[in-house]
Regions:
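N-terminal secretory/targeting leader peptides
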Residues: 31-124, 132-341
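Short, low-complexity disordered leader/linker segments with a strong preference
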Residues: 1-36, 341
Length: 341
């Protein structure tokens, strides 16, 4: 009898224990894992792009309650410049930047505003770029990309070891370029284009591999180009150079709806797009004043030389139209319409 009582007590204990276990919270084998997207950029760690992307990332972490993070990788530390577009196209990067500097046949039609001498200021470029948003959205969607934000670099100038004041001064000069259009206009103006990744510009100027480098004047200080080039030639080859922040569409579709909304809210609350254009204009103005302090000489070609260069560069537009087909033609028409021409 005693044995039966003990057995009954033991069974009761086991039943209670089992029930308690069922009521206890299940061990969190793996709490919902934080979704991490890596965002590569060619911009230096202190450059406004990097600062703005980090602010956007911080806002996203806040909006998602820590469920999603974007980690910014500056100064080509994740992928070199020419790899940025392929990386987001093939999904190695769920989020990335499409730089006008690296547009290829894959997305060349995105660049009507990047044609040589199309715009002459950041303000003019911005006005047209924002009107072209539906066109950009459509072109990116064709390649499996979702447009998040239209951003910009400042105007494109020439760092050089000798002054380039006239069209004649371009003759025979080896100029670092960053894509098909900049290569074409350099050739038309009499120079020899050399494709060099952004991260290699400093050493190319230092070793005299090139006589000059086409890029934004605002890179003088953060990239220390002032150490290896003594002249900044203000040819305004482009009033600005766009950078589109995009997501790989498959990666985007894989996000829960609330996280998609968190991304859009973070873009809005960080004011990323507007901040980019404001910072570009401020950086350009600040750089112009700063260059002499860095020991650089500013070269302003005459109006006559600029007009001559623009006329010569028109041939580059024809080449671009031939390569981009109907989409390019439509994009150019939209760009000219937006600019009131």
């Amino acid at each position: 009898m005693k044995k039966l009582a003990c057995l009954s007590l033991a069974l009761t204990f086991l039943a209670v224990a089992a029930g308690g276990a069922a009521l206890a919270p299940a061990p969190v084998a793996a709490q919902a894992k934080t979704i991490v997207w890596n965002l590569p950029t060619v911009a230096a760690p202190t450059y406004y792009h990097t600062v703005n992307y980090n602010a956007f990332a911080a806002k996203l972490k806040e909006k998602s309650g820590g469920r999603m993070e974007i980690r910014v990788h500056p100064a080509s530390s994740l992928y070199p410049g020419p790899e940025l577009i392929p990386a987001v196209l093939d999904g190695r990067s769920a989020v990335g930047t499409v730089l006008a500097s690296y547009l290829t046949d894959v997305l060349l039609e995105m660049g009507p505003l990047e044609l040589p001498f199309m715009t002459s200021s950041i303000e003019e470029h911005k006005k047209a770029a924002l009107q072209l948003r539906p066109f950009y959205t459509e072109m990116l969607a064709k390649k499996g990309l979702k447009l998040l934000s239209i951003n910009t670099w400042p105007s494109q100038q020439i760092f050089s070891s000798v002054p380039i004041r006239t069209v004649a001064d371009w003759k025979g000069k080896k100029i670092r370029v960053y894509g098909a259009d900049s290569a074409n206009v350099t050739r038309l103006l009499g120079g020899s284009p050399v494709n060099i990744a952004f991260g290699e510009v400093y050493s190319a100027l230092e070793k005299k591999t090139v006589d000059g480098a086409m890029t934004s004047a605002t890179n003088a200080e953060p990239m220390k180009f002032f150490e290896v080039a003594k002249f900044l030639d203000y040819w305004y080859l482009a009033g600005a150079a766009q950078e589109w922040l995009v997501a790989n569409q498959k990666a985007w579709d894989g996000l829960p709806k609330d996280l998609q909304q968190a991304v859009m809210d973070a873009l809005k609350d960080s004011n990323l797009e507007e901040k980019e254009w404001q910072d570009a204009a401020a950086a350009e103005e600040r750089t112009r004043k700063r260059l002499p302090e860095l020991g650089m000489t500013i070269v302003d070609p005459s109006k006559e030389e600029m007009a001559k260069a623009r006329q010569i560069a028109k041939a580059a537009w024809d080449t671009w139209l031939q390569r981009t087909g109907p989409d390019g033609k439509r994009g150019l028409e939209l760009a000219l319409q937006a600019l009131g021409r």
